[in-house]
Amino acid sequence: MAKDDVIEVEGTVLETLPNAMFKVELENGHVVLAHVSGKIRMNFIRILPGDKVTVELSPYDLNRGRITYRFK
């Protein structure tokens, strides 16, 4: 998938799930299932409920995403 095809939105982590998955509520109110991107995992960045994050969504499946950034 090309980088141009992704939709980037901001959201808040609602809960932590097993296998590094998270429930994230987007700014528009939708709740999506998101996993952590490789760069965040490599740098041991902790993501906790309540954190504000940037999520990349595929135009093909808007219910799943990838967390690419955690705001400080």
From Swiss-Prot:
Main function: One of the essential components for the initiation of protein synthesis. Stabilizes the binding of IF-2 and IF-3 on the 30S subunit to which N-formylmethionyl-tRNA(fMet) subsequently binds. Helps modulate mRNA selection, yielding the 30S pre-initiation complex (PIC). Upon addition of the 50S ribosomal subunit IF-1, IF-2 and IF-3 are released leaving the mature 70S translation initiation complex.
Coarse class of the protein's main subcellular location: cytoplasm
Species of origin: Bacillus cereus (strain ATCC 14579 / DSM 31 / CCUG 7414 / JCM 2152 / NBRC 15305 / NCIMB 9373 / NCTC 2599 / NRRL B-3711)
PTM sites of type Phosphotyrosine: Y60
GO MF entry, a single one: rRNA binding
Subunit structure: Component of the 30S ribosomal translation pre-initiation complex which assembles on the 30S ribosome in the order IF-2 and IF-3, IF-1 and N-formylmethionyl-tRNA(fMet); mRNA recruitment can occur at any time during PIC assembly.
Name of protein: Translation initiation factor IF-1
Record localization: Cytoplasm
S1-like domain: residues covered: 1-72
One Pfam match: eIF-1a
Family: Belongs to the IF-1 family.
Assigned keywords, A-Z: Cytoplasm, Initiation factor, Phosphoprotein, Protein biosynthesis, RNA-binding, rRNA-binding
Cellular component, GO annotation: cytosol
